[in-house]
């Protein structure tokens, strides 16, 4: 039977318990005797106390069934309660939380536990004065009832037993079962068992035979209780971090410690436990955190309204000053947290943001909800008007104290926590706030100028957390859930604000921001004179400092919180108004430091990250609703100057252009506006095509133009494009260009054009080497097709062989001659002047051709450049040209490209294939210098040539280019191009057949060709 009892525990758990147990009892008497008394089921006669240092010793234990005869039915496998353990445990935990929340702080007797006023009333009543905190057997069946007076159950034990089962002698078996589970659950606290075990063992061992629960279970249960009592109380006094966390959640989550301070018995136990068996802060913290975690995530019941919130204030006056901060936090917590629900808060608030994405919010909604607990007390106080007023008075009185030295954040939290129950708490808060405000103001002055014009719409609440603004440590996601380590600060920040934000104080707050703002503007680091108002503003602002949005966003009920935080205007107070009621503050104080970071973290392309807009724009709309005075007060301190009404005081800080809330946004707007204003100027389409506008602006014009030309349709813009690429010639020929400008209304000034040309040439030279040749090749790259030739004749965009016009080859020859003559003769201005195509606006492309020709014709550096001649030849339809040099250069260039294997010959093109489309498809393999589509007049078939800049790209296109065709198109036949296809009608290349035959016959392209394509290829080779 006893085996069943201990069978619930793992061997290692049992062994560790015994080791701890022995360690605790070494000073109290024979370990063997006590063990035997506590665990009658074990026959320890075989073992020495020295044997217990080994974890394996328990394997030798013999279980004595005769010792457990008294409780045969306790462990009966038929006990139906065994199957209810899981559900009971859950109910037990929930009931524990609920009951403890309802316990008055002055009365910790059984009267507080309705379930215990029955059979255990006597033992519990005697529990308070009992000198020993060691809980005895939970429910004695035998007449050993008086024994509980000395060997009393711990408060938590009784609660555990009472909540799950009504305590009575008939329910002892159930209690035993529950205790077994409690023992199992308490193994996480096992390290601390040692500290309390001595007290537990002080209880008389006479009842061990008759107890319904083994001492092991009792001990484990009591250990948990004691651990909580000590772990929660001392931390309030000693650990700066614990108080914050406990105040915020343990107040409700682990209420057991709360009654403890008020209960003499608990205080005795605490006093005894600390000196006798000190528990490390880490253990207590771990315990508290575990309990709080369990309650926070598992027990929504804890948020039910407390049944006895009134008694809580008693704790504040309770003589046990050791937990001085605790009573206040409890009062706060229970008043607010019992009803607090994140979901309820979110639903209740008019949240303008997407709550599901806390990282998108300037201040996480979760963090901002905590302040709800702050407002709650004000609400309670509002119910009793005396309280809010007192709070305000305290704040006002505290304002002079703001000069006090500013303690470190954590100690600061502690101090405030302790005094939170008293108005002094507000004073300390305000002191801290003002001290931080002074530091913040200095930082703000600098930061505001730096960040004042970054995205005002987005602020980060936590930038101020550890004075780490400068290091940009402000995390965007500051919710207790995501950042539990910050929980204490968050909660604390929320709570202090409550008194400072009574709605009654709202008018004063509104006025206060003005005075405060004025001082802010002056930059006085110590705003103590405006202090009282500022105190009201700043007192909450330390908390706001931590979760600035909390007061503004979470406290939807209280507009004052909004104005309060904005006046402080600290860059860390990044308040986003999540509700229409809080817009004033929300808009005004935004952290500019993180605006760019926020924008960038979501995505560096604002067009693709609309989520920043709601937080950025919505907060501004509500501002209009607020009174002008408030807006002015808030706007003055706000570095962003987000307020629509810029007051003269803050004018120097406020950017006048409200719509442009960030540098990036303004930059983009300027970039987009520029093309509109430039309509008819150089590159109006630069912002409409290619990469993002803000990326394009920074790129060299040559690169941009190449990209744009692919998608740009002829609309007369080409007239404006030519000056860019013609820079070299334009430099030499200012007059010619001026004439051209007369034709091109709105052409950019000469200086700007030259500057762009220099940039283009520099980038091209750096990448390709020889300036003019590279420039021409770059410029002509996109002019290979007839469409390109007609539309972008002037652009000369990176196509070294634009001479191959898809138009009539004879016409090309004539154009070549004309262009060559013109260029060689160097009659640029005359040509452009008398060129018949220059005047008609309808033929803008031809005008450009002539102008380009004229401007470049006289340029000595271009007289020898074949690319230039070809380009102009293609573009020009004018009368003057000399073709011999261009033919010569074109032939050399083609021969060079073919010899390097950079020319790809594509046959079997669809009838609707254009050079532009062909180039667009094959650009995936690499940069294309030239692309043209030609038609065989005899058969009407289309074929094309693509000249890549790199031979590797050409080889890649040969192997994979066949896959670029559409389903309704015939298969492409690709091969290395021969000279024959580039020859003018009067020129014959006798080697082209042999050069072309080799690739055509032995290339892998045939592997990708279907039968029809192969047949056509064979037929073509025969002709």
From Swiss-Prot:
Disulfide bonds: none annotated. A motif (HCFC1-binding-motif (HBM)) lies at residues 691-694. Transmembrane segments: none annotated. Gene3D superfamilies: 3.30.70.330. Residues 793-805, 849-866 have a biased composition (Low complexity). One of its GO terms (biological process) is estrogen receptor signaling pathway. This is Peroxisome proliferator-activated receptor gamma coactivator 1-beta. It comes from Homo sapiens.
């Amino acid at each position: 039977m006893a085996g069943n009892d201990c069978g619930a525990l793992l061997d290692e758990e049992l062994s560790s318990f015994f080791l701890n147990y022995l360690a605790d009892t070494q000073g109290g008497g024979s370990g063997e005797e006590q063990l035997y008394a506590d665990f009658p089921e074990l026959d320890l006669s075989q073992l020495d106390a020295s044997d217990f240092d080994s974890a394996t010793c328990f394997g030798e234990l013999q279980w004595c069934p005769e010792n457990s005869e008294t409780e045969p039915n306790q462990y009966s496998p038929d006990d139906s309660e065994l199957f209810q353990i899981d559900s009971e445990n859950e109910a037990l935990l929930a009931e524990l939380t609920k009951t403890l929340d309802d316990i008055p702080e002055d009365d910790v007797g059984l009267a507080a536990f309705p379930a215990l006023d029955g059979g255990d009333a006597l033992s519990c009543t005697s529990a308070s004065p009992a000198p020993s905190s060691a809980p005895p057997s939970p429910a004695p069946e035998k007449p050993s009832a008086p024994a509980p007076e000395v060997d009393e159950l711990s408060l938590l034990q009784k609660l555990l037993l009472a909540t799950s089962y009504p305590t009575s002698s008939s329910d002892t078996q159930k209690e035993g079962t529950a205790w077994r589970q409690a023992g199992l659950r308490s193994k996480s606290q096992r390290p601390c068992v040692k500290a309390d075990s001595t007290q537990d063992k002080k209880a008389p061992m006479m009842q061990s035979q008759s107890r319904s629960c083994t001492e092991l279970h009792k001990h484990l249960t009591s250990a948990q209780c004691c651990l909580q009592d000590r772990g929660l109380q001392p931390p309030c006094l000693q650990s700066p971090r614990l108080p914050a966390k406990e105040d915020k959640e343990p107040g409700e989550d682990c209420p057991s410690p709360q009654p403890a301070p008020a209960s003499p018995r608990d205080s005795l136990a605490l006093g005894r436990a600390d000196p006798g068996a000190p528990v490390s802060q880490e253990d207590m913290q771990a315990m508290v955190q575990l309990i709080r975690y369990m309650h926070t995530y598992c027990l929504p019941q804890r948020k039910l309204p407390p049944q006895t919130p009134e008694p809580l204030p008693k704790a504040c006056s309770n003589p046990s000053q050791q937990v001085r901060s605790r009573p206040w936090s409890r009062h706060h917590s229970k008043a607010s947290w019992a009803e607090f629900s994140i979901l309820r808060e979110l639903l209740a608030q008019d949240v303008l943001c997407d709550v599901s994405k806390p990282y998108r919010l300037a201040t996480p909604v979760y963090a901002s909800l905590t302040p709800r607990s702050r407002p709650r007390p004000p609400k309670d106080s509002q119910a009793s008007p005396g309280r809010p007023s007192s709070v305000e008075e305290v704040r006002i009185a505290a304002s002079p104290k703001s000069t006090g030295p500013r303690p470190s954040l954590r100690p600061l939290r502690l101090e405030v926590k302790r005094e939170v129950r008293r108005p002094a708490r507000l004073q300390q808060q305000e002191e801290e706030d003002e001290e931080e405000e002074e530091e913040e103001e200095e930082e703000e002055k600098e930061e505001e100028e730096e960040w004042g014009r970054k995205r005002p719409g987005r602020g980060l609440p936590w930038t101020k957390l550890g004075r780490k603004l400068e290091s940009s440590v402000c995390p965007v996601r500051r919710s207790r859930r995501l950042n539990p380590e910050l929980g204490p600060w968050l909660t604390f920040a929320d709570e202090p604000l409550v008194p400072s934000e009574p709605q009654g104080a709202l008018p004063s707050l509104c006025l206060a921001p003005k005075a405060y703002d004025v001082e802010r503007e002056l930059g006085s680091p110590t705003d103590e004179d405006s202090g009282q108002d500022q105190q009201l503003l700043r007192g909450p602002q330390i908390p706001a400092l931590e979760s600035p949005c909390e007061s503004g966003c979470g406290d939807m009920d209280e507009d004052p919180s909004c104005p309060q935080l904005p006046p402080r205007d600290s860059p860390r107070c990044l308040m986003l108004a999540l509700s229409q009621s809080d817009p004033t503050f929300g808009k005004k104080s935004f952290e500019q430091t993180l605006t760019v970071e926020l924008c960038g973290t979501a995505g560096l392309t604002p067009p693709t990250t609309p989520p920043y807009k709601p937080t950025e724009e919505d907060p501004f709309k509500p501002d209009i609703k607020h009174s002008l005075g408030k807006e002015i007060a808030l706007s003055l301190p706000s570095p962003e100057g987000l307020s629509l009404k810029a007051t003269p005081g803050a004018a120097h800080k406020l950017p006048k252009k409200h719509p442009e809330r960030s540098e990036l946004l303004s930059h983009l707007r300027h970039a987009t506006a520029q093309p509109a204003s430039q309509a008819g100027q150089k590159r109006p389409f630069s912002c409409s095509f290619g990469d993002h506008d803000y990326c394009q602006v920074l790129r060299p014009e040559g690169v941009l133009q190449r990209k744009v030309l692919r998608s740009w349709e002829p609309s007369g813009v080409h007239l404006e494009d030519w000056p860019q690429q013609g820079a070299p010639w334009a430099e030499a020929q200012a007059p010619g260009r001026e004439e051209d400008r007369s034709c091109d209304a709105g052409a950019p000034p000469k200086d700007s054009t030259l500057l762009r040309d220099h940039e283009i040439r520099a980038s091209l030279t750096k990448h390709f080497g020889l300036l003019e040749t590279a420039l021409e090749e770059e410029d002509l790259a996109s002019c290979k097709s007839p469409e390109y030739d007609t539309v972008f004749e002037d652009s000369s965009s990176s196509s070294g062989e634009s001479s191959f016009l898809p138009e009539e080859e004879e016409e090309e020859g004539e154009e070549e001659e004309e262009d060559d003559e013109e260029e060689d003769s160097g009659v640029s201005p005359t040509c452009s002047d008398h060129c018949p195509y220059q005047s008609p606006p309808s033929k803008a492309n031809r005008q450009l051709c002539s102008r380009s020709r004229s401007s470049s014709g006289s340029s000595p550096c271009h007289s020898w450049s074949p690319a230039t001649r070809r380009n102009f030849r293609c573009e020009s339809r004018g009368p003057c040209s000399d073709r011999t040099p261009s033919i010569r250069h074109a032939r050399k260039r083609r021969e060079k490209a073919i010899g390097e294997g950079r020319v790809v010959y594509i046959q079997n093109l669809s009838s609707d294939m254009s050079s532009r489309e062909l180039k667009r498809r094959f650009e995936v393999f690499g940069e294309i210098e030239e692309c043209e589509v030609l038609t065989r007049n005899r058969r009407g078939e289309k074929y094309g040539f693509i000249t890549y800049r790199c031979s590797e790209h050409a080889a890649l296109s040969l192997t994979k280019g066949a896959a670029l065709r559409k389903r309704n198109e015939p298969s492409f036949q690709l091969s290395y191009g021969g000279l024959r296809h580039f020859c003018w009608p009067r020129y014959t290349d006798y080697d082209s057949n042999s050069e072309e035959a080799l690739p055509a016959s032995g290339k892998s392209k045939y592997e990708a060709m279907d039968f029809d394509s192969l047949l056509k290829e064979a037929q073509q080779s025969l002709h």
